[in-house]
Amino acid sequence: MAKTKILNKNNKKEEIIDQEENEVDVKTTCKELSPPTDLEIENLEKLENSGASRLHIVLSFIKKNGIGIGTDLTHFEFASSFLLPHSTHEYYSDNMAREFDILLKSNIDNEIERLLGVFKYILSIKPIIEDSTRSPLRSVNGETKSSNFHVTIIDEQDKSEKIIKDNYYMVETLDQEKAFVGSCIYNKREGVKVHFNTETKTIFNGTNIKLPIIGNIIIRFEKFNEEYTITNPTLYGRYLRGFVEYCGETTITSKNSKYYIKKTNLAKPLIGGNVNMVEAKLLYGDDPNPLFKINGSWSNEMEIINCKTKETKLLYKRPFNYFTKIIPDILPTDSSIVWKDIIVPISKGEKINISKERSKILEYQKKLNWKISQFHLNTDNNIWEPIIYKD
C-alpha cells in the first residue's frame, strides 16, 4: 500500500495516510476552508513560474493552506496553475451532446437494445481528463450555454449516412453555492431527452481529490413512455499518480421495464492494471443470474458476452461519431460572455493571472444578480427542465 505525508486537519501535524483509506462519505459534513490571501496566491503563481513540477506545486498548496482530509474545496480560490480557461458548462454541454446519435439510434422497440444504447451513451459522455491537477472555472448563477447541433447517423447495414439537424442542448447554473446545474440535451421531434440535474463537491481526500456527483441522469424515450434513471460514479483526481478516474458502483434502471444494468467502475490498482476499466451485468427482475456481461475500458473498447450462448462481440470502440456541426445560441448570460476576459486573452496566447481575473468577474456577477431564466422545476417529476423545447 502506497503512503504519503499530508497534514491532519485537526492538529496540522504530519501523518502517514494509506492510499485508498480514509474515504470521505458524500454526506459527511466537511471542513470549510478559508480563502487564501492574495499573497498566498501570488506565492503559488511565482512557484509555477519558477518551473517547479506540478506535484511540487500541489503539495506546496496543501501544506501552505493547512488542508486536511475532509476539507471542502468546492468554493476555494485556486491559483492560476490549478485552473482551466473555460467554464464547467463545457463538460455538461459538449460531452453530453457529442454522442447523442447513440440515443437516437436506440429509440427502438427492443427493450434490451434500447437499454444497451443508454449504457453506451453513458459511457461515451465521460471526458478523458488529461491533467489531474487542473479544474475548469466554476459557473456562476444564471450562466448559460445553448446550441443547436447536428449529428450523423450511420446505418450499420449499408453504411449510409443521415444528418439529423434538430438537436439542442441547454445548460444553466441554478445554484452557484451548491454548484448545482441544470442541463438538457434533446430532440423534440424524436421525443428523446437527457436531463442532468446535479450538484458537485470537491473534497480533499488525502492522496486524491474526490468529486462526488450528487444527483441522477434521466433519459426519456417518449415514443415508448420509457424513462431511465442513471446514478453517477465518483470522480477521483489521483494527483500523486498523475491521472483521473471514475470509481464506484452505479445502476441504470427503467421506469417500466424489468431489464436493468449494474455497473462497477474499477479503481486502477497501485501496481499494474489499467485506468477506466468497467465491469457490468445486464439483469432481469429478481433473477441474480445476468443475461449479459460487459467488460472493458470506457475510454477504449467494451465487449459484451451473452451468458447463455457464450457469444462475445464488440459493444463499442472509441473514437465515436462526434457531432458534425454546432450552431451556438449566444444568450446574454452565455459562458463565452461571462468569462471573455479570461478566454479571449488565452486564445490569443497571452499570459494572464486567471485567479485574479476570475475574482474580478465573480464580483461583477454579484452586482448583476442574475436569476434563473431558461429552466423551471417540473413539480410532477421533480426535474429541472427547459422552459421552452425548440423544434
Swiss-Prot record:
GO annotation, cellular component aspect: cytosol; membrane
**Which GO MF terms does the UniProt record name?**
sterol binding
Q: Which InterPro entries match?
A: OSBP_sf, Oxysterol-bd
Task: Name the SUPFAM superfamilies on file.
Answer: Oxysterol-binding protein-like
Q: Which domain of life is it from?
A: Eukaryota
The family annotation for this protein states:
Belongs to the OSBP family.
What's this protein's name? Oxysterol-binding protein 2
Organism classification: Eukaryota, Amoebozoa, Evosea, Eumycetozoa, Dictyostelia
Q: Give the gene name.
A: osbB
